[in-house]
């Protein structure tokens, strides 16, 4: 992956996983409980899109337990991230994670994506395990400008035609260390 993180960033990522494991008992944040698998399937998977995060703000739609938003925010402390979710329990977890990890570069928003009205243009929309590609595009259309990008993390390419007004920029094959499963990043813009 070629990723270089400081000792403090590495510690923050592990603290994040510890917090997720603690809250998972009551809040059902993830089906993955094994620490090694959490590192691979949550942290490394989320961080695999780092090379594609250029400008900010970055909106993490359907953030859930904060994936990929929190690992990206830890790795990119000078970028601004907005973590959006409609589930109150997940918002409580995200808020606590922001406090415990002292993440000053994230904002937590409790709303449905269709209802979210940002105060500044969104540069990048990320999503991981959120919805089918066309549903993602339909629900985020009002957030996109001509320079915005949607970065949809998928396990496989969907055989769907993009709605009118969208162009697929690229399909990036992601390499996640210790994971022998396909991971794709589908990059889309409006035209």
Predicted segment positions?
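Class I SAM-dependent transferase core
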Residues: 1-55, 59, 89-92, 96-106
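Residue-level signal for inorganic ion chemistry
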Residues: 20, 72, 154, 188
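Conserved SAM/SAH cofactor-binding pocket of Class I
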Residues: 44-127, 137
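Short alpha-helix immediately C-terminal to the canonical SAM-binding loop
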Residues: 90-92, 133, 160
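Short, conserved active-site loop motifs that form the nucleotide-linked donor/cofactor pocket
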Residues: 106, 148, 169
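A short glycine-rich, Lys/Arg-flanked "PGG" loop and its adjoining helix->strand segment in the class I
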Residues: 137-147
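Conserved beta-strand signature within the Rossmann-like core of class I S-adenosyl-L-methionine
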Residues: 147-157
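Active-site capping/gating segments
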Residues: 155-191
């Amino acid at each position: 992956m070629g990723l270089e993180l400081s000792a403090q960033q590495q510690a923050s990522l592990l603290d994040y996983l510890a917090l997720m494991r603690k809250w998972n008992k009551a809040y059902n944040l993830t089906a993955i409980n094994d620490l090694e698998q959490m590192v691979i399937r949550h942290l490394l998977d989320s961080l695999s899109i780092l090379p594609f995060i250029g400008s900010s703000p970055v909106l993490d739609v359907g953030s859930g337990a904060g994936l990929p938003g929190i690992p990206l925010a830890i790795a990119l402390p000078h970028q601004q991230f907005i973590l959006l979710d409609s589930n109150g329990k997940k918002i409580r977890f995200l808020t606590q994670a922001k406090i415990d990890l002292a993440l000053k570069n994230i904002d937590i928003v409790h709303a449905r994506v269709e209802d979210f009205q940002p105060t500044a243009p969104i540069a990048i929309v990320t999503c991981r395990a959120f919805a089918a590609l066309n549903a993602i595009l339909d629900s985020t259309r009002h957030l996109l400008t001509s320079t915005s990008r949607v970065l949809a993390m998928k396990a496989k390419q969907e055989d769907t035609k993009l709605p009118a007004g969208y162009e697929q920029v690229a399909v990036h094959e992601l390499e996640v260390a210790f994971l022998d499963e396909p991971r794709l990043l589908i990059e889309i813009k409006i035209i």
